[in-house]
Regions:
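Membrane-helix interfacial anchor on the cytosolic side
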Residues: 462-482
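Membrane-interfacial hairpin junctions
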Residues: 441-458
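Contiguous, function-dense segments enriched for cysteine-driven chemistry
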Residues: 321, 436, 440-443, 479-484
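Charged, low-complexity intrinsically disordered terminal segments
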Residues: 1-439, 493-495
Length: 495
């Protein structure tokens, strides 16, 4: 936890209250006795993952939002197949929407034949028309219940870059964890695994008490589920408690209004608040959406930087050189409210200072966005004059990120419509796009009403059938579960 302002003579009790507040906000306890190593980019992640898989003797849990059918994906599949053949229990979980079309039908057959298990999270279901909105965006690996990885990287060659085509590696961050907190990472995997099918047997689960301490670092594993918003609450607490600096990195930055206000308030109080985001996103529409929110941050004193490389995919925060966060959660409504996400909050000066060093290095390859005071326009000021922003797309966004982008578009348009201030150029473009889309929809609906009415009728019938089916299943389950002598509510006639 960042340094707390203590007005009384009982700092220990204040610290206890702070720990309680963070535990309640995150829905996760603070676990001590861990060793944490910061990993940068695929060049450090992928070799570490392969080494861990090769060293496994009992179990491997492998979870990723995206697993590409490319050289990187095949290398990990083959490594898992080899361990499964040797008797190691291997379980792989990937998101159905994050990886459609990326995995051929036969991609996982060798692993299944070797005795491994593979599950796709949340494929479409007839009785849940909107269920696809909740995705498993987590990226984690647990080996033998004693070694864990939590990161922002997916399994794809895009993170390695392509020197022949002039594409730099994607910038990303994760951590390697040894110690009792690994049990919480395993528990997070087991939670989503049980949603996708039968649960992991209790006999195969690892208890934190059975893991020997590996260091002195305290870790909080924040396993967010739809509507839980644990990380959102934690980040707001950190913004309120930070005293000197709060440095954020985010890949798809369209934050909700309460968090924007928390950052603005911290900056007004003199906290050095910085936000580092991609200059060029793998989702083309996202950059103007992110930029539409810069002005309110800049006017409050928040410093905003855009990464000049191919793609910045990291999701990190570091406060006061004492507290750090690393994981899969982006600062937008899709990640904070609708997805299954996994992050670790780390209370350790060594780890926090290492992330601050990484942040300072990243700013050497970034462009600062500033306000031109004369007309209050947003402009770019190079931080590293030897480098110009690289505006190119490394690869097309996945279907899952495209769906999340639609949610972000709605949020950004709402902000632009409701803010009582002059619109920036980026915001004006968003409104033009929204207006053009609505106008086109209106013309089509007026000229060819059947083009709109028929799909609407089909969707309405689908929703109605799905709701009736779920209601029937719920009623049937309730009847089966009702024991003899169960309590029933009756209206009392007494005054």
């Amino acid at each position: 936890v960042p340094d707390l302002p203590v007005a009384s003579a009982r700092p220990a009790s204040v610290r206890l209250l702070a720990d309680q507040a963070f535990s309640r906000a995150a829905g996760a306890p603070l676990v001590g006795g861990n060793a944490v190593r910061v990993l940068r980019n695929a060049a450090e992640h992928f070799p570490a993952w392969h080494d861990a898989i090769r060293a496994a003797t009992r179990s491997i849990l492998f979870e990723s939002y995206i697993i590409e059918h490319d050289a990187v994906g095949a290398s990990f599949r083959d490594a898992l197949v080899e361990k499964a053949r040797s008797g190691v229990r291997v379980r792989v979980l990937y998101d159905w929407l994050g990886s459609p079309g990326k995995l051929g039908r036969g991609f996982w057959k060798p692993l299944a034949a070797a005795g491994g298990e593979v599950r796709a999270f949340n494929p479409p279901r007839f009785d849940s028309p909107l269920g696809w909105l909740s995705r498993d965006h987590r990226k984690s690996i647990v080996v033998d219940g004693a070694l864990g990885y939590v990161t922002g990287l997916c399994v794809s060659a895009a993170w390695l870059g392509d020197p022949l085509r002039g594409r730099e590696p994607w910038r990303d961050t994760g951590v390697e964890i040894r110690g009792p907190a690994v049990a919480d990472v395993e528990r997070a995997f087991a939670q989503v695994w049980s949603i996708a099918g039968p649960p992991i047997p209790d006999a195969e689960r690892t208890e934190a008490a059975s893991i020997a301490p590996a260091g002195a670092t305290a870790v909080r594993v924040i396993a967010d589920a739809p509507s839980a918003a644990g990380l959102f609450r934690v980040d707001q607490l950190i913004a309120a408690l930070a005293r000197s600096r709060l440095w954020l990195t985010d890949a798809y930055f369209v934050p909700m209004a309460p968090y924007v206000e928390a950052l603005r308030s911290a900056a007004r109080d003199g906290v050095d608040v910085r936000v580092l985001v991609p200059g060029a996103s793998d989702i083309a529409i996202l950059s103007p959406l992110s930029r539409s929110g810069y002005r309110s941050l800049l006017e409050a004193g928040v410093r905003v930087f855009e990464w000049n490389g191919t793609m910045l995919h990291a999701k990190t925060a570091v406060a006061d050189g004492r507290w750090a966060r690393v994981g899969s959660t982006n600062l937008n409504v899709a990640s904070l409210i609708s997805n299954y996400e996994l992050d670790v909050a780390i209370e350790d000066e060594r780890v926090a200072q290492r992330l601050e060093e990484c942040y300072a290095d990243d700013l050497e390859h970034a462009t600062e966005i500033v306000l031109l005071r004369k007309r209050r326009h947003v402009a770019a000021t190079p931080v590293a004059p030897e480098r110009e922003p690289a505006v190119r797309r490394a690869m097309a966004g996945s279907a899952g990120r495209a769906a999340a982008g639609a949610l972000r578009l709605g949020g950004a348009v709402g902000e632009a419509l409701t803010q009582p201030r002059e619109l920036a150029t980026g915001e004006g473009r968003i409104l033009v796009v929204a207006a053009a889309g609505l106008a086109l929809f209106g013309v089509v609906a007026f000229r060819w009403p059947h083009v709109v009415s028929w799909p609407a009728a089909a969707i309405g019938a689908w929703f109605a059938a799905a709701f009736l089916l779920r209601a029937f299943r719920s009623w049937r389950q309730a009847r089966r579960a009702r024991p003899e002598g169960s309590i029933r509510w009756v209206r009392s006639s007494a005054a």
